[in-house]
């Protein structure tokens, strides 16, 4: 037990989801995103049935004062329908081969997604994948962080 005290300040880098670049992006979000914005965020598998954020997007409700598609860990306690809907959308994005696929764009639009965030820690939503589709319009770029407006109409107007 004595040796454990020597490691009390050791931080697992895999658990650090918010970097200084993310904090700057969150400050931008507080000033520029509309109050009713719903931000699509990166996610990954967590427990048997739950997902978790894979970057600072998961913390945007606290850091950036905006709603996100995957609420914090307590979303498990928010009712079965809310839990299932959050998981279904997260899994659809995680497993998407093409972020511009019509079915995915329809699903994002039907859930009310207005913006997308890519944090420094990353996940399945990457700048390269989002930049390849006109439905995701870059609004903010700072280091590895990005905010996009979600505009599925831009794809339909090709």
Predicted features along the sequence, with ranges:
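Extracytoplasmic
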Residues: 1-158
